[in-house]
């Protein structure tokens, strides 16, 4: 089940239409699953009645997914972890399939993912053979359960770990690295690093403080247009990088006003497209007739003219 399906289940179980509350409950359940906490454990550590109610809803949520014979995204790692903890034959079979393991963005792993790693690379008479790539200065997913402590505990859990620092930067100029180091200089450090580059000093970094995202987008579009005219460049020589997709709308509007042609890279996920979710709902219903969210989507899409009787 995707995020929207899970949202619908929680909405039905909580009997509320408060979108913010439903998202908060969805986030709480996800964090508990990623921390490998059962509904009972979540209830035991609840700090107040609101958390206790969320934990009880978590229990009903798990029961509902079980009745649908469905899993959510968090279960895709949590359930294999539970399997490997209790079934040595299954764990051994998968260990033999994996001779080497490469883990990227390790600073953004959560408790469940770290447990999966340990279950796959450790065991009686087994020498761990894996590579973990991570940067403590790039940890940005604590809000969804990621823990930078996983980098620290690696050295404790695997004392023979060999540390290799990749300090040469192949992407940026010296000025960009200096600016980045100034921003992250006060961060708590697990590993001291001295980044350097062979690309020379590079152009100065310009920082503009704008009133809002609309003003920022307008300024970017005007600067791009002026720079192209001065340098007699092509529009294809330019790229605009932004932090999140929520910023794309204002940037697109500004580019259109300046009559700047552009191509969007990325965009909506294939499986998030409405027509794809419609087809998948039919397939899910064929596989499991008790999948209520799939039934509701299938029976209402496309519109068939059915509805409440008119007076």
Give the label of every model feature segment.
Residues 22-33, 51, 55, 74, ...:
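Short, well-structured alpha-helical segments
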Residues 47, 100, 248-260, 273, ...:
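Conserved helicase C-terminal RecA-like lobe
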Residues 4, 149-167:
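Conserved P-loop NTPase motor "coupling/switch" region that bridges the ATPase
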Residues 159-162, 167-261, 284-288:
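Helicase P-loop NTPase motor core
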Residues 1-28, 40-49, 56, 60, ...:
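Conserved P-loop NTPase-based nucleic-acid remodeling module centered on helicase motor cores
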Residues 47-153, 168-172:
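Conserved helicase NTPase motor core
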